[in-house]
């Protein structure tokens, strides 16, 4: 018989918003478990851009996705959350008012008072470039994300795409690459203007080879790339030497089982009350990129704000008879004791 795990709050998603929600809930003596489909904490920060700089976290001029994840994990240590990784929530059943029985694809069963959906954009899959045989090189020399920059040191790197990700990694990897080629289908880039300007400066200085066209063929053996053929826009072809390829064609987002949980949806996002970030189902909240409301900004700092307000409503479900007094960590000896700093 499967053992039922009982917790005050179950958080679906262990990205930055889910992690910070643990902190805000912990200050209110609310215990949390987290479930994430990934095999690591950090969400998109850990999976897609662990070494990419983030510049808009308040008070931190620059931090990488990995660095932010590590800092959040350190911050929530006092509250000892339990993580259930490589699992996906498949079913949510209402058993109380509020109260939910939640089942994962691994057969794990939770009973929680409050359910928090912090699943980002749902599950995300990189769009595969339309190049015959590309799948034979995936995971060895074709990569859809940069997890360790050092893995690309001294390599002949081919980057394909014209958006922010393609430009950012062109700029970040260029100093450690043996050679670098950027291929885009047109000489018009969708990335930030300052990134486009920096990229063109690299081209002018001979540090980057820019090809305007499309990849038509890959060469290599046993999963290892040795080169690629580009059909240029003037109908000529160009041969590129490369042993690592990074295609950035965007992501396909899939909401997954969340769509079957009885929640109102709007363009695959969950509408919420902006005072509490509660959904149409009492006791189920949505924070981070998964939710929508007028003026919504898909920023990590917005998700932190949403998690703080969510916790203030969630605690009333967990402790309906308890009078909750708002406290500041700067002055409350009670909160400081919980954090282990007093």
Curated annotation (Swiss-Prot):
The answer to whether UniProt assigns keyword Flavoprotein to this entry is yes
**Recorded GO terms, molecular function?**
ferredoxin-NADP+ reductase activity; flavin adenine dinucleotide binding; NADP binding
SUPFAM superfamilies, per database record: FAD/NAD(P)-binding domain
Q: Does the keyword Transcription regulation apply?
A: no
Q: Which domain of life is it from?
A: Bacteria
What the entry lists under Pfam families is as follows: Pyr_redox_2
Q: What is its EC number?
A: 1.18.1.2
Cofactor note from UniProt? Binds 1 FAD per subunit.
Cofactor(s) recorded for this entry are:
FAD
Q: Which Gene3D superfamilies match?
A: FAD/NAD(P)-binding domain
Where on this chain does FAD bind?
17, 36, 44, 49, 89, 124, 289, 330
| Subunit record text | Homodimer.
Q: Which family does it belong to?
A: Belongs to the ferredoxin--NADP reductase type 2 family.
**Name recorded for this polypeptide:** Ferredoxin--NADP reductase
């Amino acid at each position: 018989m499967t053992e039922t795990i009982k917790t005050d709050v179950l958080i679906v998603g262990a990205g930055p918003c889910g992690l910070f929600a643990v902190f805000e809930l912990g200050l209110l003596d609310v215990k949390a478990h987290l479930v994430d489909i990934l095999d690591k904490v950090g969400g998109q920060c850990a999976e897609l851009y662990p070494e990419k700089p983030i510049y808009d976290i308040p008070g931190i001029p620059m931090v990488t996705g990995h660095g932010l994840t590590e800092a959040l994990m350190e911050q929530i240590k006092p509250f000892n959350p339990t993580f259930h990784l490589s699992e996906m929530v498949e079913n949510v059943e209402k058993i109380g008012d509020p109260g939910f029985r939640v089942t994962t694809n691994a057969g794990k069963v939770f009973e929680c008072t409050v359910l928090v959906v912090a699943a980002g954009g749902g599950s995300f899959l990189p769009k595969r470039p339309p190049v015959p045989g590309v799948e034979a090189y995936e995971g060895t020399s074709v990569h859809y994300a940069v997890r360790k920059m050092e893995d690309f040191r001294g390599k002949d790197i081919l980057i394909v795409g014209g958006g922010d990700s393609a430009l950012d990694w062109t700029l970040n990897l260029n100093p450690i690459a043996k050679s670098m080629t950027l291929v885009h289908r047109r000489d018009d880039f969708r990335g930030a203007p300052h990134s486009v300007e920096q990229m063109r400066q690299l081209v002018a200085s001979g540090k980057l080879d820019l090809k305007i066209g499309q990849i038509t063929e890959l060469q290599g053996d046993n999963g290892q790339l040795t080169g690629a053929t580009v059909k240029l826009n003037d109908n000529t072809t160009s041969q590129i030497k490369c042993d690592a390829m990074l295609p950035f064609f965007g992501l396909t987002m899939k909401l997954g089982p969340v769509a079957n949980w009885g929640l109102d949806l709007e363009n695959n996002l969950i509408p919420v009350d902006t005072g509490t970030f509660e959904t149409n189902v009492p006791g189920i909240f949505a924070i981070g990129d998964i939710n929508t409301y007028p003026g919504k900004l898909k920023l990590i700092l917005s998700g932190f704000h949403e998690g703080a307000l969510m916790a203030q409503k969630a605690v009333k479900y967990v402790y309906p008879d308890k009078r909750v007094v708002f406290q500041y960590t700067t002055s409350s000896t009670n909160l400081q004791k919980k954090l282990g700093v007093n």
